[in-house]
Amino acid sequence: MEHNILVINPGSTSDDIGYYKGPKTVFEESARYSQEELDSFAGKELSEQIPLRRKFLLDVLKKHEINLNEIDAVIGRGGLLKHIEGGIYTINEAMLADLKRGYNGHHPSNLGGILAREIAESLGKPCFIADPVVVDEMEPLARYTGFKEIKRKSIFHALNQKRVAITAAKELGKKYKECNFIVMHGGGGVSVGAHKKGKVIDVSDGFEGAGPMTPQRSGVLPSLELVEMCFSGQYTIQELRKKMRGRGGMIAHTGTSDIADLYNYISSGKKKPGSTINCSREAAQEAFDAMIYQISKEIGAMATVLKGDVDAIILTGGLAYNEYLVNMIKERTGFITDKFFVYPGGDEKAALKEAAARALENPEIIKQYK
């Protein structure tokens, strides 16, 4: 059965909207907000952005002459809620309250659920979120660190990791809950997850940057040297956070997080106009190989979490477009399994659309947020 689904995916500087009739894309549009527009909300509650983003949404629907009464469901990007199990959740009063107050932080993704609920409620239609970044299915042993005061957290690319895992399971002729996968999502940050029978029982932190170094994240650092930097008086806490979560990894070593530009430079010696690469080709090659080495090592670590019982390794996100990276990871981790799936990119709107369709076709899978 085909369903008409409206997808709302707000980001820090943009909104992505999609409307679908079954497999057909009716439209997909993005709004990029100017710095001036965003600066007008500086220091204000996130909810004050709702009128701006609502106007874009309604204007787009009007532009494409969408009959609102034909919409079967609305789904928004999940925000910083309580840590929850993966799955599809109806946007109930408890969730709405936590999105509005920013239970786990304030980010424009919180507005996805708020706007979805608002539109759906006016139409008397169901509304959902699916697999937000706060999905937490980690087993107790995975939470431990060597400090009693510090626990490992589950923050990762849950929406895309779950989507590609479900896709890979179908290609194997199985259900997701019957499979064990290691999934690597690589973008500005990298998360590597151990998927055991439908749950991500351990995963590297793709937000704070624990795990391998990435195009923008530092990854795990030697503890003592980091402590010494913290107390050196040379950095504020904001500066160190930026070094770890925006200026680390490939940016720190090569001057860029643009992997396409970096690899072209490694291969041909040519940089794109305006390139920020600031190192030799040899240094760029070694840093790139070091990142691949660390990602591969994290995949190997997750194989031990699954006790070697791995149906496939899945590579996704923007990094999966780079054939050299994919081939080097396969070379290093092929002893774990000979089955690899590569799904470059990460289509959040498609993932949300598919989640809403599953919910409409199988209402029993819909979860309640508490």
Curated annotation (Swiss-Prot):
Cellular compartment(s): Cytoplasm
Keywords: ATP-binding, Cytoplasm, Kinase, Nucleotide-binding, Transferase
Database matches in InterPro entries: Aliphatic_acid_kin_short-chain, Aliphatic_acid_kinase_CS, ATPase_NBD, Butyrate_kin
Gene Ontology biological process: acetate metabolic process
Pfam families, per database record: Acetate_kinase
Listed EC numbers: 2.7.2.7
Enzyme class: transferase
Entry's Gene Ontology cellular component terms: cytoplasm
Family matches, as CDD domains: ASKHA_NBD_BK
Disulfide bridges in this chain: none
Name of the protein this chain belongs to: Probable butyrate kinase
Biological source species: Elusimicrobium minutum (strain Pei191)
